[in-house]
Amino acid sequence: MIDLWPAIDLINSTSVRLTEGKYDTKEKMEKSVEDSIRFYSQFKCVKRIHIVDLIGAKAKEVKEFDYIRSLRKVTTKPIEVGGGIRSKQTIENYIHSGIDYCIVGTKGIQDIEWLTHMTHQFPNKLYLSVDAFGEKIKINGWKEDAKLNLFDYVAKIEHLPLGGVIYTDISKDGKLSGPNFDLTGRLALYTSLPVIASGGIRHQEDLFRLESLNVHAAIVGKAAHLDEFWEGLS
């Protein structure tokens, strides 16, 4: 089974889900953040918890640091955090607080020199989040066009000691309509970096198909809140 990384998206320390990254589609989840983490942590196939500070992503600076730090005591699973991470100090703060991995997006996409320095200071601790409509990369909470092609950009960071590349097809996100198998599979073939699929994953069949495409792990958002998604998993 492909590694599962259940996603928890935070707004004001509350678990929510968005559709296509649009903040006006915010839907509050029934379970609390803590209860969700405890539920996910009982499964061996869950290899880490993926947490995103949505307001931080929008504001271009971390907003939920203290709350996210408090979640470290809820689980023994590794935790990765993204949203508004744009400085060495922020990365250090998270790592020193017990967070295992940090996700960088906009800053790393806009400033490859900075990304290079950070990956060498924190080797294999950073994941690059590349969010795109198809091959067109978006930045700043998915609101702006980076004017970069997915494959052209990944070629430039291929040599860096990143933990991997998280690819989200925004058009699929939060819709439970299936991931973009074509582009995700092409990306997994294109780069030697581990590729993590995100956006649109519905059920276990999607996971098996992603695994067949040599995708390293799957970030599961909305589907992870459905009991039937977990049936038969251990």
Curated annotation (Swiss-Prot):
Localization, UniProt: Cytoplasm
Reaction(s) this enzyme catalyzes, per UniProt: 1-(5-phospho-beta-D-ribosyl)-5-[(5-phospho-beta-D-ribosylamino)methylideneamino]imidazole-4-carboxamide = 5-[(5-phospho-1-deoxy-D-ribulos-1-ylimino)methylamino]-1-(5-phospho-beta-D-ribosyl)imidazole-4-carboxamide
Active-site residue numbers: 9 (proton acceptor), 131 (proton donor)
S-S bridge residues: none
Keyword tags: Amino-acid biosynthesis, Cytoplasm, Histidine biosynthesis, Isomerase
Tree of life domain: Bacteria
InterPro entries for this protein: Aldolase_TIM, His_biosynth, HisA_bact_arch, Isoase_HisA-like, Isoase_HisA-like_bact, RibuloseP-bd_barrel
Recorded GO CC terms: cytoplasm
Single GO MF annotation: 1-(5-phosphoribosyl)-5-[(5-phosphoribosylamino)methylideneamino]imidazole-4-carboxamide isomerase activity
EC number in record: 5.3.1.16
UniProt pathway: Amino-acid biosynthesis; L-histidine biosynthesis; L-histidine from 5-phospho-alpha-D-ribose 1-diphosphate: step 4/9
Gene Ontology biological process terms, A to Z: L-histidine biosynthetic process; L-tryptophan biosynthetic process
Family statement: Belongs to the HisA/HisF family.
Record PANTHER family: 1-(5-PHOSPHORIBOSYL)-5-[(5-PHOSPHORIBOSYLAMINO)METHYLIDENEAMINO] IMIDAZOLE-4-CARBOXAMIDE ISOMERASE
Name of this chain's protein: 1-(5-phosphoribosyl)-5-[(5-phosphoribosylamino)methylideneamino] imidazole-4-carboxamide isomerase
Lineage: Bacteria, Bacillati, Bacillota, Bacilli, Bacillales
